[in-house]
């Protein structure tokens, strides 16, 4: 079964239909049912509960969450993909127990109405909102952001109802299963990677605002400063040599962590991670490569918590911050002309980076 174009996906959403959305065309991908929240009916909720079987969620923009005075469930997500769950909600009026398909549909409409405010909903409830990152899939390549983006492109409020698709036996549906599901229910299938491509034709959320040569202990680098217009934050890239050649360059996408980069703290289990200095040294040894430095301000409390997390012997989930910033780092690499790369990282599944015309051909772990 062929993957449908984003234009076809948007048209079905505009008509109030559901679609299936995967990360990309990989056979191991899972998929969500998705439709515009403004168009949801009780029968749609019933279909999602009966056939999708996952957790029915409502994707909302940060602005809408503020409008509803809706706080995040936790201030820092420890989920593997950094999903921003808010407190669950119920419509303040017009529902009974809240769990029926009609009640859940009513709750969704109460939350996405133009004039909706905090008085229109109560907590807890049977609908689980997810707060999308500003910038949508160009900043975080997730189903939450894709739901908001697709609803907006289709002409509706930037809010969608999504649910993971599970098989009869309770396992997650993969592409082969999703194709059979789509054929059975006459649904179109799209990908977040294609949505990223679609948006990049006309928009982006980062721009290079300065370039200058700097001399470091590892040699000369060209320092590029980027402005993330979605969050009004600055990030940097350090480039050495000609990275536009036929051979994939070394690439490190690095998120600042003072406990690691300044104090040199390492995991008690012996696992070594790439510090900023190690990455720069590795690039200098080879003579060509890129270090993208994504900078997010840290307070003393943030650093203290980070230290506790790094020295704890308890296994930790990783990748949540990485997952959230895939889009930002990918846009910077695109701007620098990188396509195929040898990534300074332990093996990690980077969602939908094909949408940015990027491909990891090799992972290089820190030794």
Where are these regions (language model features)?
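Catalytic domains of riboflavin
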Residues: 1-367
């Amino acid at each position: 079964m062929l993957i449908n174009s984003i234009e076809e996906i948007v048209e079905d959403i505009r008509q109030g239909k559901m679609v299936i959305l995967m990360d990309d065309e990989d056979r191991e991908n899972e998929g969500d049912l998705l439709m515009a929240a403004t168009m949801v009916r009780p029968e749609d909720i019933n279909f999602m509960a009966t056939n999708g079987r996952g957790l029915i969620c409502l994707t909302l923009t940060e602005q809408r969450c503020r409008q509803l005075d809706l706080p995040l469930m936790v201030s820092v997500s420890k989920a593997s993909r950094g999903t921003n769950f808010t407190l669950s909600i119920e419509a303040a009026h017009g529902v009974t127990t809240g769990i029926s398909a009609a009640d859940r549909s009513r709750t969704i409409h109460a939350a996405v109405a133009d004039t909706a405010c905090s008085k229109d909903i109560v907590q807890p409830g049977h609908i689980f909102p997810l707060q999308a990152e500003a910038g949508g899939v160009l900043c975080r390549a997730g189903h939450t952001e894709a739901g908001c983006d697709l609803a907006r492109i289709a002409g509706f409020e930037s809010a969608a109802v999504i649910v993971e698709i599970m098989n009869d036996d309770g396992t997650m549906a993969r592409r082969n299963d999703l194709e059979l599901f789509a054929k059975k229910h006459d649904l179109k299938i799209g990908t977040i990677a294609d949505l990223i491509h679609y948006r990049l034709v006309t928009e982006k959320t980062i721009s290079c605002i300065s370039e200058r040569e700097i001399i470091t202990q590892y040699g000369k680098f060209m320092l590029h400063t980027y402005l993330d217009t979605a969050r009004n934050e600055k990030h940097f890239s350090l480039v050495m040599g000609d990275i536009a050649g036929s051979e994939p360059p070394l690439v490190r996408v690095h998120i600042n962590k003072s406990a690691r980069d300044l104090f040199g703290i390492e995991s008690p289990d012996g696992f070594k991670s790439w510090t900023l200095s190690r990455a720069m040294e590795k690039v200098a040894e080879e003579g060509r490569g890129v270090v993208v430095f994504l900078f997010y301000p840290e307070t003393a409390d943030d650093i203290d918590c980070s230290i506790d997390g790094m020295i704890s012997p308890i296994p930790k989930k990783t990748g949540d911050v990485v997952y959230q910033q895939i889009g930002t780092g990918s846009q910077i690499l695109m701007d620098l002309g990188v396509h195929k790369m040898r990534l300074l990282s332990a093996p990690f599944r980077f969602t939908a980076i094909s949408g940015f015309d990027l491909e990891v051909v090799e992972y290089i772990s820190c030794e």
